[in-house]
């Protein structure tokens, strides 16, 4: 995968087709034989865990940002992707009112933050890389395409409150 490369991410997944609608097929390029499909159905998507000599890990955690929704009543926050400087600020997963740390995806990222930043090498080597995608428009469609924006480790985590115009709650 190359930074900026756009993949077709259709509703009906197909691991065998290399190209769909003139774009590289996400499911073909992320195919892990004998494992579940690699999906981007929510904001935070861990790949199915596998066992290696050191234990059980998720090979990677994929995040998905939807810039076309920035500032909407549903998503008042904004993710920042500055791939030329190697910096991404991802806002997590919490559209609903409630404790954001109870959300599965946020909980996974907080756990990974602790692993990525551990002083203990044995713990750190169990870290899952974070892989970043943005949903983009292509072929006249707003959905069904994702752009690879790189991978990284978590260096900072903070709790941030945004006003939800839809529910009128902070």
Residue map of PLM features:
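Acidic, glycine-rich low-complexity segments with interspersed aromatic residues
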Residues: 17-145
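Compact mixed alphabeta submodule
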Residues: 139-170
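Second RecA-like catalytic domain
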Residues: 1-24
């Amino acid at each position: 995968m190359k930074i900026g490369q756009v993949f077709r991410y259709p509703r009906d997944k197909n691991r065998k087709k290399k190209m769909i609608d003139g774009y590289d097929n996400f499911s073909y390029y992320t195919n892990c034989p004998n494992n579940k499909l690699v999906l981007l159905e929510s904001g935070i998507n861990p790949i199915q865990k596998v066992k290696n000599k050191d234990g059980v890990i998720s090979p990677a955690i994929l995040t998905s940002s939807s810039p076309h929704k920035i500032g909407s009543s549903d998503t008042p926050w904004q993710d920042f992707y500055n791939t030329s400087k190697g910096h991404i600020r991802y806002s997590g997963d919490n559209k609903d009112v409630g404790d954001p740390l109870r959300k599965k995806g946020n909980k996974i990222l907080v756990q990974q933050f602790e692993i990525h930043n551990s002083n203990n090498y044995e713990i750190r080597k169990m870290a899952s890389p974070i892989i970043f995608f943005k949903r983009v428009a292509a072929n006249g469609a707003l959905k069904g395409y994702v752009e690879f924006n790189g991978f990284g480790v978590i260096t900072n985590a903070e709790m941030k409150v945004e006003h939800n115009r839809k529910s009128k709650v902070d």
